């Protein structure tokens, strides 16, 4: 049975780690990096998660450009799994494919949308409630101002004739 950790980040840069197993873990199995998964699997009701990366139990990273879930040795010049110290340096690195499997130990995911993780977990109140009321008032004032401007323009045209 699959069991792994899911590290979820949002646009604010905050991250949370969740452990999933059994049925919740099965929602991730077979998915590729870049696919979307329902947030209910980790307790984020109403959210959608995009799979962004991961690693196996030995710490080998998942790469989006390697198909399947098997290990593959690549000659890398940089990117996911290897950071060269000199220009032109290359190294053969073992990486995993882009598909989540039983060998996956950690999956990295990002919340799709602007809702922070704390709001999705119910730890904080959404900040949008205060902003909506103010923006509606501003929109009404702008409409009244525009209407007055049109009447003034009509008077100016009549005076010009």
Swiss-Prot record:
Disordered: region residues: 119-161
Pfam families: Ribosomal_S6e
InterPro entries assigned: Ribosomal_eS6, Ribosomal_eS6_arc, Ribosomal_eS6_CS
The entry's keywords: Ribonucleoprotein, Ribosomal protein
Single Gene Ontology BP annotation: translation
Feature: compositional bias, Acidic residues: 122-161
GO MF terms, alphabetically ordered: structural constituent of ribosome
GO CC annotation terms, alphabetical: ribonucleoprotein complex; ribosome
Similarity field: Belongs to the eukaryotic ribosomal protein eS6 family.
NCBIfam families hit by this protein: PRK04290.1-3
Name under which the protein is recorded: Small ribosomal subunit protein eS6
Organism: Haloquadratum walsbyi (strain DSM 16790 / HBSQ001)
Organism placement in taxonomy: Archaea, Methanobacteriati, Methanobacteriota, Stenosarchaea group, Halobacteria
């Amino acid at each position: 049975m699959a069991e792994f950790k899911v590290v979820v980040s949002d646009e604010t840069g905050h991250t949370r780690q969740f452990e999933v197993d059994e049925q919740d873990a099965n929602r991730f199995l077979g998915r590729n990096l870049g696919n979307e998964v329902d947030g209910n699997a980790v307790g984020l009701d109403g959210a959608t998660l995009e799979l962004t990366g991961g690693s196996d139990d030995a710490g080998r990273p998942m790469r989006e450009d390697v198909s399947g879930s098997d290990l593959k040795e690549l000659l890398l010049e940089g990117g996911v799994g290897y950071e060269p110290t000199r220009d032109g340096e290359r190294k053969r690195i073992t990486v995993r494919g882009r598909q989540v499997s039983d060998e996956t130990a950690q999956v990295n995911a990002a919340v799709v949308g602007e809702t922070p993780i704390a709001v999705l977990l119910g730890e904080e109140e959404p900040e949008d409630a205060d902003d909506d009321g103010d923006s509606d008032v501003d929109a009404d004032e702008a409409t009244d101002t525009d209407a007055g401007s049109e009447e003034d323009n009509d008077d100016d045209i009549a005076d010009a004739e």
